[in-house]
């Protein structure tokens, strides 16, 4: 009979640079290895991720699987077929877990029997220290899933972050079911973000309650290229795209013309000249705040346009079929 209490599940796409750091940290886990296992899904990587994963099989209770269809949803759904134990920890391939990470989640689940969704502390592991404008004005939760300011206790599932979350296996069902349009998806340049949030919100809608604790901790590796303005603003656009899917209630009562929310469209148009001008000035908090808001609005409009295009294609195909 299996002694496994916990399954750690994650997918990786071209994660060869961060996987060794993550897996080395898991080798230091304080929980006996017969009581937990790792299910890692290689999501069609083109680097040496598979070789890195396989090289740790003798040191860790590690199972490696391959999902050729690009997209985190498909990779994790494959991983769901191999879960064991009462608790499932979902994470990413770029975290550094504390030695007692798994034990802390088990303790949390025991201490909070009325909750079925659990979040843990996420602090940064910067490859390059961010500039003051980013530290002072950037939403570090949206950008890097950091949650150091989140108090311990019951929370909305919307505050559960993908790099450090756990779920009672009994509430999960058979697959990682979220909206098909949500990323990560390596096949497109820009995708709507928010897949982890959508997954937790669906479980909450079905009756599960969420709890945050600062005790199960990970450090999230933030790559050097992720602290420059260009990457951050692209992240803002992805966030805006994701809002349309994950939080449709924010737009239900908005006046729309041609499927677009008029207020967002007008603000975006009015701020285009200011955005052009402010880019001529040095990096600063004022510049960042203006460009960030514009990027989020651009993402919102982009997603509404995408959905309108999809709807029109569906209508045309249905008319043609008749």
Where do the model's predicted regions map?
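Glycine-rich, basic loop-to-helix element that forms the pyrophosphate-binding segment
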Residues: 67-83
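Short, flexible, basic/aromatic active-site loop/helix in glycosyltransferases
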Residues: 137-157
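A conserved acidic beta->alpha catalytic loop
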Residues: 42-51, 95
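Non-catalytic, C-terminal membrane-associated alpha-helical segments of glycosyltransferases
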Residues: 234-238, 252-322
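Conserved donor NDP-sugar-binding/catalytic core segment of glycosyltransferases
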Residues: 100-134
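Short aromatic/hydrophobic "clamp" motif used to bind/position activated sugar donors
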Residues: 88
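Acidic donor-binding loop at a coil-to-helix junction in glycosyltransferase catalytic cores
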Residues: 183-199
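Short, well-formed alpha-helical segments that are part of the catalytic scaffolds
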Residues: 15-29
